[in-house]
Amino acid sequence: MENNTASSPYTKLELVGRGSYGAVYRGICNLTKETVAIKILNLDTDEDEVSDIQKEVAVLSELKQSDVENIIKYHGSYLVGTNLWIIMDYCHGGSVRTLMEAGPISEPCISLILRETLQALKFIHHAGIIHRDIKAANILVSMSGNVKLCDFGVAAELNINRRKRITFIGTPYWMAPEVIRDGQEYNVMADIWSLGITAYEIATGSPPHAKEDPFRAVYLIAHTAPPRLNGNFSALLKEFIASCLQDVPQRRLDSSELLKSKFIKQYSRMSISELTNVVKRYDTWQAAGGIPQTLLLGEEADDGSDPDQETSDTAASDDGWEFGTIKQGQSNVSSITGTSTSTTTAATSSTTVTGTVIPKSSTVHEPPSSNDSHPLLQLFKDSKISDDDSPSNAEGASTEDSKGEVSYSQIELPSLDSSNLSSKKSTIQSKHTKQAEDYDLFVGRTRSNSKTSSDQSIKRPLPRVVQRQKTSLGKRGISMSPMKPGLRMPSSFDLQSRSISMGAFEQLSTPLEAPAHKHSAVLQPLEVNRSISIPPPKSISPSILHKPSLESASSTPKISSCSSTPKPFNSKLRAHLPPLSIGSPAVQPLANDNYDSLGVRGLNMELFNDYPGNMHNIKSVLSLEIDIVLGEMDACLKSLECNLLNRKAYNE
């Protein structure tokens, strides 16, 4: 155990995992005695790299506020000299990759792991985050069976320029084809491809092309058909992986759709407590003498190559916190046990005691000289950092000064805004002046400046919910700011934009440019003078028999004509009624006032006095009013037809 002072909020214990960019230790909160995981990153680097770290920690802060169950909980960040301590939840079960060493994982448990991972991906994708490193080593399982997604691109943000190319070469096995292809952008669907490779990895024990050289794997992923799961597996699992591994991104199912897939729904009633059996099986296997590959190899080979051909002197533990993403990264990143100014190195020996790795000794290096102009201090100068911060060794161990104390400074990062990314935007916009990249949604980093590559494929249109997110594009397309859509206004407020069908109920003698509420000539209700028991004539004049028109009906009002005849209004209700049978010689007797007719009320033109901005409400109310009037007109016509038939029968 490291001898920390009383001022330190956390006590760092044994090493539980190591990557090319940092290390993870088990720790204890001195206040609550809670077991936590401490990820230590060396920040003694350039200013732009520190800015990337600040942005990523700000993303973790946003995730902390959301308190999502399937995402590793972030407790805070502390500056210890030139080291950044990221405090997270500790998962005793380790990663899924480590649990696979005790034996194959059954399909029901695979479904549970994928279901919980999809819940996490659904949240971060809707929040505007691309994980970019989905694999079994980044999916943790707690002792109670809870699945946690971890490692949200801190290592990827640290790797810029030269290191970015190394990351690309070292970990191609989980990458989507659009990520590998030169000059092609990608979005959240790259994570869906990686999830399909992860499902393949859990089922078979290794990702596709695991035995190939990384350069060969890059070529195969970009130029061959997507891999398919073969062997003694269920058809539902094969279908799930095939729906993820589509070469064209827009053909892949998103996280919400995958949660509704048959393979996930088949085991939807299973509890996550079933995964505790997988953790217990691993503990039993280890107690029986099983040695994890992380103990044999140090850093686990994430590229899936044969472990017998790999050598490493990096120590790690059996808890399975494998965060390494670069196969040959030790030569490019400062060692976690020394700083950039150190000239001496010390090998850390370790012994296995009850499944944990406890360092015996470590060489304490001289701390670098204090420099107030360090980019780290300049970047976080607005944060609440105490003035007595002093650098320590790169491992985060307590380098005691003359008083034997080390300073801890909690970082309270500001939220992401445009000022944090102003320098990056200017660089990107100078390269891509023809594209409004600040509004491209969820676009990943561009592997090349060339935008005319023949290998580019069609971009997937993002889901409707995702399209509401506004991306403030930096180097790698991470955003957390939702976009507020503008107020939707009608395209025009003049009468020309209205339906011409209104002309069937309005007098069109007034010019069309006049305001709608000033139309006063309306089709008046059909007024019928009713009389009682007036017998119809028993004989009909021959001249009347050949005149089926209604011109002699004095009760029918005349409508003023217009230069342009309005189109008839085709009512939906009229389309469902049988055709009228009025055009017969018996029409003339019905032209008098001797039949009972239903009243038809006029259209309320006061609806047009409302503000034009409420056009949507006016349209709804007007549609209802028109349907009511048409219904009354149809009833009136049916009554007229019935009277006609009765009169015809009476005459006969």
From Swiss-Prot:
Domain Protein kinase: 10-264
Alphabetical list of InterPro entries matching this protein: Kinase-like_dom_sf, Prot_kinase_dom, Protein_kinase_ATP_BS, Ser/Thr_kinase_AS, STE20/SPS1-PAK
One Gene Ontology cellular component: new mitotic spindle pole body
Active site, per annotation: 133
Gene coding for it: nak1
Stretches for region Disordered: 298-352, 383-487, 539-567
EC number, as in UniProt: 2.7.11.1
Organism ancestry: Eukaryota, Fungi, Dikarya, Ascomycota, Taphrinomycotina
KW Methyltransferase (keyword) present: no
Biased composition (Low complexity): 334-352, 415-426, 540-567
Membership in a protein family: Belongs to the protein kinase superfamily. Ser/Thr protein kinase family.
Annotated protein name in UniProt: Serine/threonine-protein kinase nak1
Biased composition range(s): Acidic residues: 299-311
Localization: Cytoplasm
Compositional bias (Polar residues): 446-456
Function, in words: Has a role in the regulation of cell polarity, growth and division.
Keywords on record: ATP-binding, Cytoplasm, Kinase, Nucleotide-binding, Phosphoprotein, Serine/threonine-protein kinase, Transferase
